[in-house]
């Protein structure tokens, strides 16, 4: 995979950002980000390819095709990253794309993550209750204080029962909600699945830089 990705970059085989019609296909920044992850995983500080990983991260973060984590330019609020009206925003470097509308390209994750036996109050169709948020993950969010918006974006801790007209707050009521959106058919969600994000590469770059040259002000 190292040779394949380096060859793609050396020969300029991918554009810096795909045209709208091809959005979702891997572009040059996706290739750089993936190669950086490979080098960061397989090598260590002192290896040339470890330093290469840091350089690749830097190039991605400086690209006009993605949001700038230093200035905030072209980035969006966390709750908008996963919004189906804002897909492939500049926080997203690479994602698995889905399309609802009964065309065979819908996302299954809304149904997979919804609470079992929720009576279609969370989503239409079969619900599997996978990836149920634990007490530990809830605590990890709340320990960061009320300003951490990710908890409410990522996790629902209750749902409304339209039959009883009451909130379900006990038992199997928690679920990962950021991939849940209204569907008319089960397993036919619209939400894309981000695979590589700007925040991901910014954190990787910080880790690599710290390992290579130590912390800086």
Language-model-derived ranges and their functions:
Residues 1, 5-8, 53, 60:
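Tetratricopeptide repeat
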Residues 13-24:
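Flexible helix-coil transition and linker loops at the boundaries of alpha-helical arrays
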Residues 23, 55, 59-62, 66-213:
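Elongated scaffold/linker segments in the mid-to-C-terminal portions of large proteins
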Residues 38-47, 211-214:
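Short coil/turn linking the two alpha-helices of tandem helical-hairpin repeats
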């Amino acid at each position: 995979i190292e040779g394949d990705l380096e060859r793609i970059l050396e020969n300029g085989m991918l554009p810096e950002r795909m045209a709208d019609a091809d959005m979702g296909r891997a572009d040059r920044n996706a290739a750089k980000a993936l190669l950086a992850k490979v080098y960061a995983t397989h090598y260590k500080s002192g290896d040339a390819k470890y330093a290469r990983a840091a350089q690749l991260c830097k190039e991605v973060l400086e690209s006009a095709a993605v949001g700038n984590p230093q200035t905030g330019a072209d980035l969006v609020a966390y709750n908008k990253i996963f919004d189906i009206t804002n897909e492939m925003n500049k926080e997203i470097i690479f994602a698995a794309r889905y399309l609802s509308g009964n065309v065979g390209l819908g996302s299954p994750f809304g149904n997979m993550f919804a609470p079992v036996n929720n009576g279609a109050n969370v989503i239409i169709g079969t619900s599997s209750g996978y990836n149920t948020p634990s007490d530990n993950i809830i605590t990890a969010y709340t320990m960061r204080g009320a300003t951490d918006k990710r908890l409410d974006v990522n996790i629902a801790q209750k749902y409304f029962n339209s039959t009883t007209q009451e909130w379900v707050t006990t038992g199997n009521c928690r679920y990962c909600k950021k991939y849940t959106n209204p569907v008319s058919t089960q397993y036919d969600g619209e939400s894309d699945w981000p695979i590589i994000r700007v925040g991901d590469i910014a954190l990787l770059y910080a880790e690599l830089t710290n390992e290579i040259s130590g912390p800086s002000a």
